């Protein structure tokens, strides 16, 4: 079983974009930025435990960081791993969670 500490380190932040919003509305899919070494099983367990929902599937991808320059200096942004988490029918994820 996955430890409580590991569950808290797997999910970094929700990924907010136009594509993520469309996926949430049409396919009941939520997009998260996750730890690079996180597995699909860990992501599923973390979402189910933290948000108390049932997960249907998890798809992951790694976006490569862009090369950026400022004058003569050149650097590179970090790679980011994203997880598309599809929830089962009738399940809804509320980020606010009862805040008033």
UniProtKB/Swiss-Prot annotation:
What single Pfam family name could you report for this chain, choosing any that match? Ribosomal_L23
Gene3D superfamilies (alphabetical): 3.30.70.330
Q: One GO term of the cellular component aspect? A: ribonucleoprotein complex
Any signal peptide, and if so, which residues? none
GO biological process terms on file: translation
Keywords for this entry? Ribonucleoprotein, Ribosomal protein, RNA-binding, rRNA-binding
Q: State one molecular function term (GO).
A: rRNA binding
This protein's assembly is summarised as: Part of the 50S ribosomal subunit. Contacts protein L29, and trigger factor when it is bound to the ribosome.
Q: Please explain the role this protein plays, according to its UniProt record.
A: One of the early assembly proteins it binds 23S rRNA. One of the proteins that surrounds the polypeptide exit tunnel on the outside of the ribosome. Forms the main docking site for trigger factor binding to the ribosome.
Family per similarity comment: Belongs to the universal ribosomal protein uL23 family.
UniProt protein name: Large ribosomal subunit protein uL23
Organism (species): Vibrio campbellii (strain ATCC BAA-1116)
| Gene (UniProt) | rplW
